[in-house]
Structure formats: structure tokens, C-alpha cells
Regions:
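S-adenosyl-L-methionine/SAH cofactor-binding core of RNA-modifying enzymes
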Residues: 63-85, 89-128, 132, 138
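A short beta-strand-loop-alpha-helix capping motif that often carries His-Thr
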Residues: 106, 182-198
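Long, charged alpha-helical interface segments
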Residues: 192-247
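Short, hydrophobic/aliphatic alpha-helical segments
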Residues: 37-48, 114-117
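Structured adenosyl-cofactor binding patch, chiefly the S-adenosyl-L-methionine
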Residues: 136, 140-184, 189
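A short aromatic-anchored loop/beta-hairpin motif
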Residues: 42-43, 50, 54-69
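Hydrophobic/aromatic beta-strand patches that form the interior of the parallel beta-sheet core
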Residues: 4-6, 34-36, 103, 126-127, ...
């Protein structure tokens, strides 16, 4: 999978995506990250990417021109469609014959979850546009992107932070990213789990007087599986009761 991230703050994305599992996934050619500065697609000497909103209001709005230019340059298109057609066909909705899925990180988007991550992990190419300021010109949403996505009901400094969370959740589902493929299935929120993951323990078996539950040391796999299921249900009931019944 190829993932292009278009942002005003590329360094926010580079560091976390070059560590741990994301670094190994790139080294194994599981995923290919490309991080771009939106200002590279501006045409004025000051590299302006925002302007005041029509109708007045607080803050600034991201201009459509550099966003359209960036996405059109990065989109994987059907080879039957020449680049000259792209530049001459100025007024149109969406990019024709496109193979890429275009995402806008925005607090007004659909709330991201594990099922959406699994669905998007089937794509071959994602282009992620990171919002900033008071948002983007609405023509970007109407005529360019495929999905607006929010990672939660809170406001971040910029969309680059959200983009890192977004691509990490997707890339770890790609075959070859994790050391144990079953790990992604057993995680909380996975498509095969209706709630949260249960508690985990490791050595030592006793720490400051707190002991690991005996069942985990018993070697009885059926009882261990039963205990884990019960504990997962208990944790879900206590922390996320809204998840109960989703997988039934």
C-alpha cells in the first residue's frame, strides 16, 4: 500500500512513522509512506495556503488551489487518461478514472473506528489531506475528496496529528506489519471482537504481593480462554458499555 500525506507540518508525521512497527513495515515493503508539504503546490512567492472566509468570521480557511493541485499530482489514474486531460478539464466533480482513495482529516468527518480501518486497509493507495485553521474551502469536500474522517470528538492543533493515528491503525492491519498476524485479530475493537481486550500479565508471577491469576498459570487452555472472555466482557461493561452487543 502507498500512503501520501499532504500537510503543512510534515515533520509531525515523519518521526512517528519512522519508528517501531511503522518503520519495520516500510523496511519490509508492506507500506510506502510519502509525506508532502502542501506549500510545495502554491504558485505565489509567499507560498500562501489560506485566506479569510467569505461572509466574515474568525480564523482562516485553507485555499482550494494548492489542495487540488497536490491531490491531482499524487493521484494514481487509469493509464488511458493522459495528464493533459487532467489539466484541461478544469470544471468537474472528483478526479476521473482515479485508483486512489482521498481522505480529509477533519473534526466534522465520520468518526474513525476499527471497522473503517479494516475496510481502508484493502485500498492500494490513500491520499490524506490534513486540515488546519478553520478548515478547508468546501469545494474541496464537494468535488475532490472521497471521505471526511475524524479520529474523535475533540479538537487537535492540526490534522497531521490525526493523520498519524489514522495511518498507524490502517498499516498495522496489513499482512506483514505485525510479528504475529493474530495480534490484530485479538486486539480491542477488531472485527472478530465485540468489545475490549481483557487484561494481560507477564513475569514475574508475583510483584509486590500482587499475584497473576492462577488460571493463567494452569496450562488449561480452555479455562484460560474462558477466563479471558469473562474478563474482556467485564472490562467492556465497566469502560465501554456502548460496545456491548455490536458483534452479536
Amino acid at each position: 500500500m502507498r500512503i501520501d500525506i499532504v500537510t503543512l507540518f510534515p515533520e509531525i508525521c515523519r518521526a512517528p512513522l519512522n519508528e517501531s512497527m511503522m518503520k519495520r513495515a516500510q523496511e519490509k515493503d508492506v507500506v510506502d509512506f510519502h509525506i508532502h508539504n502542501l506549500r510545495d503546490w502554491t504558485t505565489d512567492k509567499h507560498h500562501i495556503v489560506d485566506d479569510a472566509p467569505f461572509g466574515g468570521g474568525q480564523g482562516m480557511v485553507m485555499k482550494p488551489e494548492p489542495i487540488f493541485a497536490a491531490v491531482e499530482d499524487l493521484s494514481e489514474k487509469d493509464q488511458k487518461t493522459p495528464n493533459t486531460e487532467r489539466s484541461s478539464n478544469v470544471q468537474r466533480s472528483k478526479i476521473e478514472n482515479r485508483k486512489s482513495k482521498i481522505i480529509l482529516m477533519s473534526p466534522t468527518g465520520r468518526r474513525f473506528d476499527q471497522q473503517m480501518a479494516a475496510q481502508l486497509s484493502q485500498e492500494s493507495h490513500l491520499i490524506i489531506v490534513c486540515g488546519h485553521y478553520e478548515g478547508v474551502d468546501h469545494r474541496v469536500i464537494e468535488h475532490l475528496i472521497d471521505m471526511e474522517i475524524s479520529i474523535g470528538d475533540y479538537i487537535l492543533t492540526n490534522g497531521a496529528i490525526a493523520a498519524v493515528v489514522f495511518v498507524d491503525a490502517i498499516a498495522r492491519l496489513l499482512p506483514g506489519t505485525l510479528g504475529h498476524e493474530r495480534s490484530a485479530v485479538d486486539d480491542s475493537f477488531s472485527s472478530e471482537r465485540s468489545g475490549l481486550e481483557g487484561p494481560q500479565y507477564t513475569r514475574p508471577a508475583e510483584f509486590r504481593g500482587w499475584k497473576v491469576p492462577e488460571v493463567l498459570l494452569s496450562g488449561n487452555h480452555a479455562e484460560i480462554a474462558k477466563w479471558r472472555k469473562e474478563q474482556a466482557m467485564k472490562r467492556t461493561r465497566e469502560n465501554r458499555p456502548d460496545l456491548l452487543g455490536r458483534g452479536d
